[in-house]
């Protein structure tokens, strides 16, 4: 998750990381990256780290990073499994496009 955090924060200087939605089942909360609205949400799952893009269906994904939540009308997500290579340039482009979408 730390590598993803650094990449997301580095994609746009205005992106802010916050921890939200603390509850008894998840006392550590959930990392959320915002810039004029939520860009993406991080989640540590049992076998993966998931980045969820609440407006993902509106984002262009020419490199095919989205691999889950593909049937949703709004949301798209990327599950990263241990050993997966992070396509940094493509992920950075999704973050930048997410910021642009929020600002439009």
Where are these regions (language model features)?
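Charge-dense, helix-prone N-terminal extensions
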Residues: 1-104
């Amino acid at each position: 998750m730390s590598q993803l955090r650094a990449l997301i924060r580095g994609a746009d200087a205005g992106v802010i990381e916050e921890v939200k939605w603390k509850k008894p089942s998840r006392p550590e909360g959930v990392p959320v990256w915002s810039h004029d609205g939520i860009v993406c949400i991080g989640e540590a799952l049992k076998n993966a780290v998931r980045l969820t893009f609440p407006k993902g269906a509106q984002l262009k994904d020419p490199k095919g990073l989205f691999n889950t939540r593909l049937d949703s009308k709004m949301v798209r997500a990327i599950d990263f499994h241990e050993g997966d290579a992070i396509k940094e340039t493509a992920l950075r482009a999704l973050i930048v496009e997410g910021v642009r979408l929020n600002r439009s």
